[in-house]
Structure formats: C-alpha cells, structure tokens
Amino acid sequence: MQCTMLKAKLHQARVTHAELEYEGSCAIDGDLMDMAGILEYEQIQIYNIDNGERFETYAIRGEAGSKIISVNGAAAHKAQPGDRVIICAYANYTSAELINFKPSLIYMAEGNEVKGTSNAIPVQVA
C-alpha cells in the first residue's frame, strides 16, 4: 500500500514577488528549499491564507539567503506581494516507510525568517 503524505511545509511564508510574465513556477529561497527538503522542479501546492486561493505549481531555486518567494506565471493572479502562504510538497510512501515517517515543517516569521521547525503538528483541541 502507498499513502500520499505531507513531505514538507513552509508555513506562513510571505510572497515577495508576483511575476506574471515569468515562465511559471514558484521561486523559493534556496536555503529554505534545502531546510524543508523541497527539490527543484518538485510539484508543490500553495495555499493563500489571505485570499483563500489554492493552486499547484512547481518549485524553482531562488537565490540562497534572499528570502524570495516569487509566484510566477499564471499563478501570479492568485498571490500578490505581502500575501501569507503555506507551501506544501507531498510524496508517496510505502507502509514500511511510514513506520519512521516525519514531515519537515518550517514555520516562518516576518521577512521570511525561520522562527521554528518541527516534524509534527500539535494536536488540535476544542
């Protein structure tokens, strides 16, 4: 059996650029990609916290240390500079791989600084 699981998440990243005429994709600071384990050209989903848009594209490496999150091409209609987004990558895992599975969760602060990391989402309480 295979299960599709959350592999990596950049939580509450800020969009720094929206480039409609760029070829497409989402440029992510290379350091953030490495920290999260997101690969260049990997399929990602982006959830816009500010306007509710949800869309799919692929990641490209942005300049390391730049804090760039650039939503490009047609997706630029769905996010604007300053919007808070959640960027997720998913992967398929076998039952054996799930035994030790842990996602990579990166929590962002203002200016796309990393404020924390985790490998588990806390239990939601009523």
Curated annotation (Swiss-Prot):
Binding site for substrate: 57, 73-75
Biological pathway: Cofactor biosynthesis; (R)-pantothenate biosynthesis; beta-alanine from L-aspartate: step 1/1
Classification via Pfam families: Asp_decarbox
Compartments where located: Cytoplasm
Modified residues (Pyruvic acid (Ser)): 25
Top-tier EC class: lyase
Reactions listed under catalytic activity: L-aspartate + H(+) = beta-alanine + CO2
EC number(s) given by UniProt: 4.1.1.11
Cofactor notes: Binds 1 pyruvoyl group covalently per subunit.
A single GO BP: alanine biosynthetic process
Keyword Lyase belongs to the record: yes
Cofactor(s) of this protein: pyruvate
Posttranslational mods: Is synthesized initially as an inactive proenzyme, which is activated by self-cleavage at a specific serine bond to produce a beta-subunit with a hydroxyl group at its C-terminus and an alpha-subunit with a pyruvoyl group at its N-terminus.
Active site: 25, 58
Subcellular location, principal: cytoplasm
CC per GO annotation: cytosol
Listed Gene3D superfamilies: 2.40.40.20
InterPro entries listed in its UniProt record: Asp_de-COase-like_dom_sf (IPR009010), Asp_decarbox (IPR003190)
Top-level taxonomic group: Bacteria
Keyword line: Autocatalytic cleavage, Cytoplasm, Decarboxylase, Lyase, Pantothenate biosynthesis, Pyruvate, Schiff base, Zymogen
Molecular function terms from GO: aspartate 1-decarboxylase activity
Subunit structure, interactors included: Heterooctamer of four alpha and four beta subunits.
Family indicated by similarity: Belongs to the PanD family.
Role: Catalyzes the pyruvoyl-dependent decarboxylation of aspartate to produce beta-alanine.
Protein name: Aspartate 1-decarboxylase
